[in-house]
């Protein structure tokens, strides 16, 4: 009897080993994508949200993450099912005028993204090593290009670098959470019970949505899965999608925990002490007297890792957008130089990086429908998706997601035009 149990256990262990090996083969694309969900724009909105409104907006991060998981699965599914990325499918399906409109809006989103990510890396270098902002900006550009250049040696190499940087961000904020000692009963309550304290919170809520659900990686994810999309059989595609869903769940929930930690630490440290944070530099300086020098260093390291990794991912997404929509394939170093200009201009003019980051995230939230609607139109089209076309439930979820984003953006626009935010 014992022998049978041992044999059964061995078979289970062997099966689990095979499944784990299979999963590790597919692990990666979602972690590249997840970097965009913990970029410096998230630092800006989450720090502001926590210092101004305590734990009230954690639920926004939760539901933004649920939306992000759904959209990234849809993007990956499109890439696996069709063999094309989302911009390429748009250029195939939509009339030329619409395609150019989608391309321009996608490029604007990429510029807003690059601004946030580039500023994050620059601020990280400035805060940690006191490198002047202008020099730090150029150094950020060099590091970003070096990361993207490693793609020459295979996508797995870039995935490994990005995974390492995400691990650094995770460890830094795990340390921050440990020493901040938040009120976990409040954290739990506000994670599941929605509340918007006032009209000013609406701007931060939409900023959190824009920072957490990123349009450029909706385009990018459909490209990243192509690397492993070598067997065109139906069975292979189904297996690929199954593994990619697990990849997405692991990566995106890691991003959710990091985002929630940012807001929780801000609420537990800044709001609790009646401190309203108005700049990233102020957040860094204020942490030291409240939680110690190691806390401010952890914050700076997390910001630096976030800026470097997300800036590299932004460059990759920009290439996918330009090549897919209009067939242009400019060198990466030229692309990096072009996207450096807005960030360096803001630095040179002395504009507050925190406010620039928040505005960039709001811009991204308005771009979201331009990425979401084409994605959902294509994934529900049986002609292109065949067996992978959306089920009725997925279509309903798609309509709900698109409606939620547009209603939230419409409300913000209305309040902005009235001058109430």
Swiss-Prot record:
Report the family membership: Belongs to the NRAMP family.
Q: Which InterPro entries match?
A: NRAMP_fam
**Cellular compartments annotated:** Cell membrane
* Matches recorded under Pfam families: Nramp
An annotated GO BP = iron ion transmembrane transport
**What's one GO MF term for it?**
symporter activity
- Which spans are transmembrane here? 27-47, 51-71, 100-120, 128-148, 160-180, 201-221, 248-268, 289-309, 337-357, 358-378, 396-416
Q: What keywords would UniProt list here?
A: Cell membrane, Ion transport, Membrane, Symport, Transmembrane, Transmembrane helix, Transport
Q: Listed GO cellular component terms?
A: plasma membrane
Function as written in the Swiss-Prot or TrEMBL entry = H(+)-stimulated, divalent metal cation uptake system.
Q: What is its main location?
A: membrane
Could you identify this protein by its name? Divalent metal cation transporter MntH
Q: Does the keyword Transmembrane apply?
A: yes
Membrane topology category? Multi-pass membrane protein
